[in-house]
Structures are given as structure tokens and as C-alpha cells.
Amino acid sequence: SDLYTARVPGQELRAFRGVTVLPAPARSVLALLADVENMPSWFFHMKSARELDPSAGHYGHNHYLVIAGIWPVRDRDVAIRASTSQQADGAIVMSSVAQANLLAVQSCCVRIPRMESTWTVRALDAGHTELVLTTSSHPGGSLPLWIANMVAADMPRKTLEAVRREVKKPAYAEVDTQGSAKGREFVGRFKF
């Protein structure tokens, strides 16, 4: 995996980007990314994840995520609007943007006021996929910059390492036969 951080003009917190090549078909990677409820199994410090409107489908949908705080920092949460599209070159792009009006502020957490992230899934051949994660956010509340930047540096590496392990599970590796009906339907919308 290749990892990059960058300064964002006007912000103290760095943006990050992680790039890896997975020994898995793009269908499997996409099925994993679309399985919102399973995100805590592979996304660094994700405590819980759920769809806010499961009937909306995966082209445009809303999620609620809770990210575990590192002591002594409180947990963070964010409601996001996500969309998925296929580019002319075949890459599939899943984009998420924080939307404060999707869900009232919860007492459990500090609300993340700004977050933008993109997953780009690109089939290299039948058994290999390039996966690119880019994220820029503001963690909200009072948070020491060194903690925020430490998490920003660890998140892409640890998340991509966990994706590499998780995508081997039958629900994703064999999405067409052992995956959920929802996962099969979702990946079936795209050309690989």
C-alpha cells in the first residue's frame, strides 16, 4: 500500500490518501465496501455503522457512522450522504459527504462537521483490483491536533490492511454464490 498525507489550505488537519492493489476481483471489493453494517470489522476505529434509509438503494443513500475516540477523546459521529457511479474508464467511485441535517446530534458523540471521502475501485484484471481511499475531514469539538493527525496517518494504512483480510471472506470472495442478495444486486449494477 502507498500512503500519502497532504495539507488542506485553510485547515490544520491533513487529508489522506491510501492506494493498494488487492488480490481480489473488483466485484468482491465493491461488495465489501457496500456492506455498511460490516464496516466496523474493517474500517479503522469504526464503532458502528448503519444505513439511515435502507430502502433507497446504493446509488444514493445515507449512513450514520460512529468512530471510537482514543482516550481521552470522546467518540465522533457523522451522518453522510453517499453516492456510487461508474466512470467512463470503468472505475467505480463511491463518494460520501457529511450532511448535518440527516440526523439530529446524538448525546453519545461529538458530531463531525465536515467529512468528504471517496473510494475508487478499479479492476486491473479478473483477480486484481486497485483500491484508492481519499478522505478529508474536521473531527469537530476540541481535539488536540497531534491526535487528529496521528489518526489521519494511521487510518488509511490500517483500514486498507483490514480490507485486504476481509475481502477474502466468502460473503465477498464468492459474492455471486455466498454473498447477500443485497450485495449481489448491488454489484450486478456495474460492468467489470
List the model feature ranges, each with a label.
Residues 1-192:
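Eukaryotic helix-grip
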